[in-house]
Amino acid sequence: MPKLESYKRVHTEELYFPNDQKLWKEQQEALVLLEKFNQTSVTQPEQQMELLKKMFSEIGENCFIQPPFYANFGGKNVHFGTGIYANFNLTLVDDTDIFVGNHVMFGPNVTIDTATHPVSPDLRKRGAQYNKKVYIEENVWLGAGVIVLPGVRIGKNSVIGAGSLVTKDIPDNVVAFGTPCMVKRKINDSDFKTYDHGKKIDLDEFI
């Protein structure tokens, strides 16, 4: 019987057992860096960024993650663009790749999940899982408490309302919310002129 090499199946959407020793060693090393990041003072932004560059697969400039921050593999499979802001308790179940575009905003308590399990109880009791990559495109805003499930893609510029459960792809340039998350409307011209139920945007005169 051939030996199952679980570490080769992590990024392929195939079933595997995560107790593979090679995977466990990689995870331990990543979690040590994550622990250091969460213990770093807010007065040490340079040290925080230095740690994030070691932790993440990719991370651009001007990114900020408010501790505490959680990730299964400490960010090892996370690809961040530039100018990303994440409020506290961002949770990335990064068993496979999570791609986040430039200028994405995460509210507090957002969860991005790539790992899932088969329905079969026999397989689940043995710990079997498989992973599906998640894509958050540029300029997306995820409100507080949003949960994004494995395999989802959220299109650029879209807004996901607080508390939403995103189970399917969301297109570009829409406002969507709910459980399950559904598109409510498109982003339109008035959104560039007003905010909060019709208040005029007046920031241009200060820029």
Curated annotation (Swiss-Prot):
List the catalytic residues.
Answer: 117 (proton donor/acceptor)
Q: Where is this site: Transition state stabilizer?
A: 87
- Give the GO molecular function terms: galactoside O-acetyltransferase activity
Top-level lineage group: Bacteria
Subcellular location as annotated: Cytoplasm
Q: Which EC number(s) does the record attach to this protein? A: 2.3.1.18
Q: Which GO terms describe its cellular component?
A: cytoplasm
Name the principal localization, coarsely classed: cytoplasm
| Pfam families, per the entry | Hexapep, Mac
Q: Which reactions are catalysed by this chain?
A: a beta-D-galactoside + acetyl-CoA = a 6-acetyl-beta-D-galactoside + CoA
UniProt keywords, alphabetically = Acyltransferase, Cytoplasm, Lactose biosynthesis, Repeat, Transferase
BP GO terms, sorted: lactose biosynthetic process
Residues bound to acetyl-CoA are 87, 144, 162, 167-168, 185
Query: Which family does this protein fall into?
Result: Belongs to the transferase hexapeptide repeat family.
Q: Subunit notes for this chain?
A: Homotrimer.
The name under which this protein is listed is: Galactoside O-acetyltransferase
